[in-house]
Every structure is written in structure tokens, then in C-alpha cells.
Amino acid sequence: MKTASTIMTTKVVTVTPETSVAEIASLLLEHKISAVPVIDDEQRVVGIVSEGDLLGRPPCGSPRGWWLRLFDESAACLEEIATARHLKARDVMTSPAVTVGEETPIDILATLMRRRRVKRVPILLDGRLVGIISRADVLDALARYGQEAASR
């Protein structure tokens, strides 16, 4: 069975604990990703900020995601939106993040993701971020593994 290092994305978009939620929202949209690991100065993962972390905080009872309102100056509740602009990654991140080492077998990773109900997992080497794996990456790897096994 393949390991995390064989399927991980190595060019990971990251933020620091001091990154603003507005900047995080922009990064998610710009890179078409659903989460960013939060790292310290030594590339150690201290948390993760996902779309769910951002969307889970609607101001004024609005059904619209509050972070989308950061881009809409005409929206109601400007005071709350102004407050939201001052939030940082450290204020909204999930911490600690679920992480694994790069030698973790993919089947173990899939089980962990299911049990912990996470959609992506930062991959570490010597405690430092070296990649990230999404559920789609795991499904693709398991499907390819199944096809390879069937063709033997």
C-alpha cells in the first residue's frame, strides 16, 4: 500500500496565526482550495482554517457566509463586519489539526479521516509541514490501487 508521501500535494498554501480572515478568504478563493494549514515560524502546524471555520460564523443571523460579506461593503451590520475584519487565523482555526507523518499508509489515513471527520490532513516530516492530502486524493489513490490489484 502506498504512503502519504506518494499522494500528497507538496506546494501547500499556508498562513500564520496573524493572517487576517479576509486574506484567508481571498487565498481560498484564489487558489480554489477549501482550507489552509496555519504554521509557525518553524513550519510546524498549529491549526487549520477551513471554509467551514469561516462559514460557521454568520453575523446578524445572516444565512450568507460572513466572510463573503467582507467583500461587500454595502452589506448590513457593518459594525459586525468591521469586527470580523480584525479576526485572525488564530481566532477561527481548528487546533490542534489532525496531522500524520509522510510514511502513513493510505488505508490508515483514510480510516483516520473518516473517524475524525476531516476533509484534509497536513503531512509532517520531523514535525514540520511537507504536504497536504484531501479526501479526493485518498479516493483517487484507493481507486487506482484497486484497479492495479484487479489487473494482476
Outline where the language-model segments fall.
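Bateman/CBS regulatory modules and CBS-like beta-alpha motifs in cytosolic regions of diverse proteins
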Residues: 1-33, 38-41, 45-46, 68-112, ...
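Short hydrophobic beta-strand motif reused across regulatory alpha/beta modules
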Residues: 47-50, 124, 132-139
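A short, polar/charged loop-to-alpha-helix boundary motif
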Residues: 55-71, 139-152
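Structured functional modules or segments
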Residues: 118-119
